[in-house]
């Protein structure tokens, strides 16, 4: 996370440069919303007929509160109408008014605001009309909700408290929590807007942290709303600071501390409502008895933003607990930043909050008010104890029993970060002693040895920062002037090591009083081995002293070695990894640039590795025959790079991913080109030779001759599978923590000739699972057709499966599909949106009945996310938990009727579509059968190429996350079909050539103009005129062969995709065995 790597003193600059929105975009969006509000007032919010009058408009959301982040933000435009005389009126007329407002909005946008684009996403909030304003460069956007509302407050003056009747009426309306929050937007906005600018900067910092946590792959829907963190930030500032100028690092530290204490939080304000009115007072008492955390909206007491029963605050708390070692929480001298002190704020070493209540200054204090008894701990309960802080300032989660290994399998998922801090990180005191001892040893050798060193490098886990408590390893590489080549090291090594040992034995006499130096049996010919032992701290370190040839020389940070270094190594005739000591510095630098939390994950993996070795000593392979622990370090870095790349992440997810890769050891192919690469011909041939060797292959990033993957992985794989079902991988709701999406080999590192094997091994779904899914879908479709709308004139005409699963291009793992339900109640395209909530409700009920009444070979789950406009379910393998298909259920108008396979639809279908549509591809679900048939009829090998392209595309989405929307994946499928058709239509083509052709077309996106006429053409005048219009639009153009309104090339970041495509063309996957680039087919970018 970029925030974590920012020094505490630089956070103000970080907020100003990285988080505050661009003024130009803010001003354009403000003008646009102002003009829209004026237009709605003029038109009364309706077109034609007698229109309700707009009483006032209020801008809310983060944009209205002044807490909008750069990039993407939200805004609420609340339209108060005179036709609403009560809260209840809003429900009755909302749909009608929203429909008319959309018409007004579309009419108003006929004259667009320069520099902005307006788009309508899928409408997922029943009480609002949602649209997005995007800058033309696609760097900034604002999600706007247009909300019609009851003007309960009237023209309230600033700072004036609403009448209690406002809230008693709200409570009597029978509303859900926060249902009418829009009515109080003005109060909510004013509550934040009076705050100092720096407090709003702190809010931006907290929100940025929250969004980074969301990017880790956690389900954003399960986390509390970000507005809850805005309120928590204000609470922290009020209780601990209340100054206009303060340290952002201290403020952030305080807010994260509160998040850790979420189970004790009870926060509310009485600036707008209070206990004076009996009805409101009784309601507040009930609210304050809710599960913690409780964070009441200061404008609407029915809205509990904390909602401890619903949101996963523990996920945020877990991340908060693990981030205090980062530079943003360290002062210039390395001292930790302290949090603010105050009532209701966490205290060092305490597990609770002293005073978790926030009151208005004019409100009676708890001591003087009988109304507040409900917020105190229940009778008989004791306040949280406050133990004396230990060395880390926190109580240990697992009692330390001398001589007993901690059972990792029983550590709860959310406690893994603390487990690492308390039990795996080495003692700072012992580390200091070792550093002191090493300095003394090096001084001794420098002053007394005959053979002089040019320089020294510290390696091993100690040098890399991955050393465990209770024992680590250090490599001291002594680069000697007498070695001028790799071959010089062998003949003189024994003599030099004997001299070094003699010097150490004679010179070491209690040089570090707390440490003893011991020489074990010497079993590594190229090194002098000894131990530094601290009896008092019960810790030791194994030290290896290695004289070596300085092959690399003094390199500045980030500089690649001269290719000649490695060409000399390859021609030296060395054994595998024989000269790895010469590259210790590169190895250390490769690891040291990694974030703190990744190193913590490495510690966890190594601790597990040690436990496996210790528990199975004498039962199976000896620990020496296991792969080296360093192989697990590299595998952990590989997992993080490919699956996460965030400074903060879920520790259990990372751990599970590494264990998953261990289980796939027979397919592991892992290497890096940070120090050596395929640009040098000799190195390219060497790497290609390495890639032809049996798996696992885990090449050292510093020494390409050293495959650290050698060893017996079977025992590790068995133990990894056994650990997968233990407590350390179970989330709070009892479900298994899901690993990151990481494969044991990378596309870019796969030779072109091995692409077919890559697809079959890693991309093709399991055939048994696909058969089970198809059988389950057939059962579900039949059930829905027979049982939906039994006592209704509505009939299910047919149910059609769409998406990649239906087309035969699904990828292994988690894929998406559509189940389109064609209904008789829709007689034209524009009716599809009618009765959607009612129809979805009926289909949901029947899906749940099907789930209960039918037997399935796969796990069938209907989504619990009860959005009245969206319905989804998933089918998951019972035996392979990473294999699943997520289905969206989509009601649709049967525009095509019973179409005979291979026949063309009537041109009238497309004439009606052209006259009906408002947004591109709006009714594409009606053409699902045609979309499916267009792909499913293609040769098997072309579908394999489509899988390869989709896999490449998904890797690109990880890289470009947060930088704008890439073109839709379906567009890449069509581009692949086009490349094959224009490239010769050979059913047994060269996979690398096909892939290379698609990449070439992506780089030529500015010229792309692709369409088909198998379903529609220009013979009908209306359709022909429309096609001409479509084809005259800016490139790229990729028209959906089933739906001519759908241009899959429009309004997306093709430039990002093109950049990745250009990079891929020089990778091994696009290069022949002789190092010559694969050539694309001769395909033009336009039809």
Swiss-Prot record:
Positions of region (OAS domain 2): 411-742
Span list, region OAS domain 1: 6-343
InterPro entries named among the record's database cross-references: 2-5-oligoAdlate_synth_1_dom2/C, 2-5OAS_C_CS, 2-5OAS_N_CS, NT_2-5OAS_ClassI-CCAase, NT_sf, Polymerase_NTP_transf_dom
SUPFAM superfamilies per UniProt: Nucleotidyltransferase, PAP/OAS1 substrate-binding domain
Residues bearing PTM N-acetylmethionine: 1
Residues bound to ATP: 804, 947, 950, 969
Region listing for OAS domain 3, in residue ranges: 750-1084
Domain of life of the native organism: Eukaryota
Co-factor requirement: Mg(2+)
Record's keyword terms, sorted: Acetylation, Antiviral defense, ATP-binding, Cytoplasm, Immunity, Innate immunity, Magnesium, Metal-binding, Nucleotide-binding, Nucleotidyltransferase, Nucleus, Phosphoprotein, Repeat, RNA-binding, Transferase
Family: Belongs to the 2-5A synthase family.
Protein name per UniProt: 2'-5'-oligoadenylate synthase 3
